[in-house]
Amino acid sequence: QKNYEDAYKPWSYLFNNAPKRTKNIYLHGPKIIKGLIKNTSDQARKTTLVDSLIMVYDQRNAYYPGKEAYVLGMKGADMYKYMKTTTVGLQASCQVLRGSFEMAGNESTASVLNYYFMATTKLVQAKVLKVEDLIALFSDLSGVISYKEAKLTQDIYNAEQTEGLSSKEQKLLKKNKKELKTLGD
């Protein structure tokens, strides 16, 4: 059972008082906070929780470096999900997603590519960015998408030709199929 309210207090204590104790603080924290955001109707609390969620990603990169582009991508995607109703929120999410994309390049996740494009599109619609910016981004993303589709298709094919995949290999195959589907959406 997902009782986010009960999980939040001990998680928050560790996050604030022992931030380097375990990486699990940063792996499970976003799930707990997103569960609380989903289950609250109090707008002020939602805003505070979104701020906390963003802080989790920042602190994860500070205390557990090595996956900065990936973590920035998750941060940017969540910023888009929760802050897309304001131009300032869109600009902030777009900036974070751009940073993730620039760091990761061909290794960007499909969700980063999708959210980056959606945020840019909304900023063009709001007349904050120009259509030319969207066209340039489309060109940049198209190359990465083509590369990822080819690589994922090959990885999936190779895995499906292998007999007796380990559970880890089966999880990777499932993840690759999901990523390929997301690229196509």
Short names for language-model regions:
Residues 1-185:
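Preference for long, solvent-exposed alpha-helical segments and helix-linker "stalks"
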